[in-house]
Amino acid sequence: MVLTRQVLEEVENTFIELLRSKIGPLVKSHAGTNFCSYDDKANGVDLVTALDKQIESIIKENLTAKYPSFKFIGEETYVKGVTKITNGPTFIVDPIDGTTNFIHGYPYSCTSLGLAEMGKPVVGVVFNPHLNQLFHASKGNGAFLNDQEIKVSKRPLILQKSLIALEGGSERTEGSQGNFDKKMNTYKNLLSESGAFVHGFRSAGSAAMNICYVASGMLDAYWEGGCWAWDVCAGWCILEEAGGIMVGGNCGEWNIPLDRRCYLAIRGGCESMEQKRFAESFWPHVAGELEY
Amino acid sequence: MTIDLASIEKFLCELATEKVGPIIKSKSGTQKDYDLKTGSRSVDIVTAIDKQVEKLIWESVKTQYPTFKFIGEESYVKGETVITDDPTFIIDPIDGTTNFVHDFPFSCTSLGLTVNKEPVVGVIYNPHINLLVSASKGNGMRVNNKDYDYKSKLESMGSLILNKSVVALQPGSAREGKNFQTKMATYEKLLSCDYGFVHGFRNLGSSAMTMAYIAMGYLDSYWDGGCYSWDVCAGWCILKEVGGRVVGANPGEWSIDVDNRTYLAVRGTINNESDEQTKYITDFWNCVDGHLKYD
């Protein structure tokens, strides 16, 4: 069975209601408090809060009650090597994206609720309660920011005139040509006059927020390695419904699965051929190949 | 002569919200033909709007404060424009012009005043997110015209420690040569687990907005070179009012002028103890790989 547009829209509205009435207020009221009570996840900068876990639990309870046959994948319950994205309808959820922002009170944390089917994102809702920005979309039904349809203004898409989202990431080990070194070298390539010489980079500290800003045309592209399916699923749907595309972060990867962990998001507001040329002009500046 | 700083702050707030803000918001993203700054690289974008807004600001402040000096980004002449002890408005009509051109919602107006070369009034207004941050010397800080309880905020933030901090960084528009290399090498050291191991870096593309966010307690510090007095003057005053501090970007530059062109801005701490700030600054400087130098 493939879900109809009407069902997708219903799921979208369920996400919106859940975020507006329950999750948003929780995230907003707790951001930037109790700094010392967080436990570290993979290393010193990958942070998990008790609230993150609690919120995921609330989301899971609500969604499985309403859609008991759908599968659920969340950041906090993910088990490496065990959790898999199948063809069935699957909720892919990040209770708090931008956890570091959340802990510091920097107003760019959000909740990201996505639904995938046949391994593709088909519903996405991203809510930043601090700035009251709610992005939402479902396949075939358009993309919206606070219930205003997202219409990306038409203009050329040129790498040398672009504003790109880049992040520091949580991998920090120098040397031996690891991902950290490749990322730093890629940033140099993109920024330098002898490289792409882009207009600038921005870092909001949240993959979902970055993708939504690309979707709305505020940014031209977002390049990142290391994020997970839950970081990108919702934003990916919003991006595509707004006319953008998602390709791989490594050279030549035009079609990637949701959990590829290495992404290049490119905005709409231009021809599809321009998007392809943008990717082709971007990829040579990627220093080496990111591996996850 | 005694200057009523609170009154000037109020005047600048109204100028920002009533006159400048609406222009920035309505014109953001509409500039298709960029006006390239003379002698600058293509990524340093000046729009006609920027110049018009500065003229509007200049006319408004001149009428109200005819004896005060004025320094603006658009009227600055290298080698000629100097900051004296006289009361001097230091103005960036649109900070974050690249954001402005791209309609990324973090362009703002930054209005500052120095007396005896010290920032004593600061007003920063981002009309896209309706955020007005202001302060005047001795009068604390206000967010959207309400006194901001920064002490509670600092309490919730905990200790100021480099490897628990979120740092704002900006590559700037100069993308070759020693300064660019120093910036990239320093970013790498700050992030690396062998050196700074900071929680992360952020960049929203506006120095003034960044300093406002530090004052609000959202970010811990901001390290940059290449910006001018008008980029930092307002933010500097606001930051000082909440216990923050501005030093140079290069090691050992504890005392700098507003036009130093390299800066490390650091947030306040709960007891406003200088030891914690001093240690943070020293640890940060240990990650600076090279030396930033601007004419």
Curated annotation (Swiss-Prot), chain A:
Activity regulation information from UniProt: Inhibited by Li(+) and Na(+).
Transmembrane residue ranges: none
E.C. no: 3.1.3.25
Gene Ontology biological process terms, A to Z: inositol biosynthetic process; inositol metabolic process; inositol phosphate catabolic process; phosphatidylinositol phosphate biosynthetic process; signal transduction
Q: Which cofactor does it need?
A: Mg(2+)
GO MF annotation terms: inositol monophosphate 1-phosphatase activity; metal ion binding
Supply the SUPFAM superfamilies for this chain: Carbohydrate phosphatase
Sequence positions that bind Mg(2+) 1: E75, D94, I96
State the family named in the UniProt similarity comment for this chain: Belongs to the inositol monophosphatase superfamily.
Q: What does this protein do?
A: Responsible for the provision of inositol required for synthesis of phosphatidylinositol and polyphosphoinositides and involved in the inositol cycle of calcium signaling.
Q: What is this protein called?
A: Inositol monophosphatase 2
The organism encoding this protein is Saccharomyces cerevisiae (strain ATCC 204508 / S288c)
What lineage, starting at the top, does this entry show?
Eukaryota, Fungi, Dikarya, Ascomycota, Saccharomycotina
The gene is INM2
From Swiss-Prot, chain B:
- Would you name any one GO CC term? nucleus
User: What is known about regulation of its activity?
Assistant: Inhibited by Li(+) and Na(+).
Tell me where it mainly resides.
cytoplasm
Localization of this protein: Cytoplasm; Nucleus
InterPro entries membership? IMPase, Inositol_monoP_metal-BS, Inositol_monophosphatase-like, Inositol_monophosphatase_CS
Q: Which Gene3D superfamilies match?
A: 3.40.190.80, Fructose-1,6-Bisphosphatase, subunit A, domain 1 (3.30.540.10)
* E.C. code: 3.1.3.25
Annotated substrate binding sites? E73, I94, D95, G96, T97, D231
Keywords for this protein: Cytoplasm, Hydrolase, Lithium, Magnesium, Metal-binding, Nucleus
Q: Name one Pfam family in it.
A: Inositol_P
Residue positions binding Mg(2+) 1:
E73, D92, I94
Q: Which cysteines are joined by disulfide bonds?
A: none
Q: Where does this protein act, in terms of pathway?
A: Polyol metabolism; myo-inositol biosynthesis; myo-inositol from D-glucose 6-phosphate: step 2/2
Single Gene Ontology BP annotation: phosphatidylinositol phosphate biosynthetic process
Amino acids binding Mg(2+) 2: D92, D95, D231
Q: What does this protein do?
A: Responsible for the provision of inositol required for synthesis of phosphatidylinositol and polyphosphoinositides.
State any further remark.
Answer: Present with 2440 molecules/cell in log phase SD medium.
Q: What is this protein called?
A: Inositol monophosphatase 1
Record the organism: Saccharomyces cerevisiae (strain ATCC 204508 / S288c) (Baker's yeast)
